[in-house]
Regions:
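Alpha-helical scaffold elements lining the catalytic groove of polysaccharide deacetylases
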Residues: 15-39, 45-73, 90-93
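Generic structural signal for hydrophobic
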Residues: 2, 32-33, 101
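A cross-domain feature marking catalytic cores of carbohydrate-active enzymes
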Residues: 9-12, 42-44, 80-83, 113
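C-terminal active-site subregion of NodB/CE4 polysaccharide deacetylases
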Residues: 52-167
Length: 167
């Protein structure tokens, strides 16, 4: 049995580790969250940059998500792209990657977009830009959030600064 170093380390440190038992516990948490109104989305299995990977890599990654996560969350038709990427520019979705994801059951596509408003509603999909609200954004670009709240009033002065820049 060959496995990634990280998973192998878990087995070494916890010889009674049971993936089935962990999945059972995760499903209970997901079910409780859904009962409270939470919705779940894919962020891809391996935090993939869908704008840069090939179709075959996207297919393999999506299948891993569907095999390992969908059974826990009951499936999802929402995908939130990592790395601020998208399937294309502002034009309508098209191409092999879109057709594959659409065929895999996704209807809602979200990218990370710092603009104040971006929604594209089409017959086959709903596309929305979203803004990340995190310490990095609040520290380096508070002006991008000023229409939502006053960053100075919520940024904890005890928080260690400066926030490390991303590479």
């Amino acid at each position: 049995l060959r496995m990634s170093r990280g998973l192998g380390d878990v087995y070494k440190r916890q010889p009674d580790f049971s993936l089935a038992k962990e999945r059972e516990g995760a499903k209970k948490v997901a079910d409780a969250m859904k009962a409270e109104g939470w919705l779940f989305a894919s962020h891809t299995w391996g935090h993939q940059n869908v704008g840069q990977i090939g179709l075959e890599t996207l297919q393999t990654d999506t299948q891993k998500f569907k095999d390992n996560v969908d059974p826990l969350i009951g499936g999802t038709d929402i995908i939130i792209f990592a790395f601020g990427t998208d399937l294309c520019g502002p034009e309508d979705y098209h191409g092999d990657k879109f057709e594959y994801l659409k065929g895999a059951g996704y209807n809602y596509f979200c990218n990370v977009d710092s603009s104040k408003y971006y929604v594209q509603i089409r017959e086959r999909y709903f596309r929305q830009g979203r803004r990340n609200l995190d310490g990095y954004r609040m520290y380096y670009h508070p002006e991008l959030l000023e229409d939502l709240f006053d960053v100075k009033s919520v940024f904890d002065p005890v928080r260690p600064t400066p926030v490390p820049p991303m590479a």
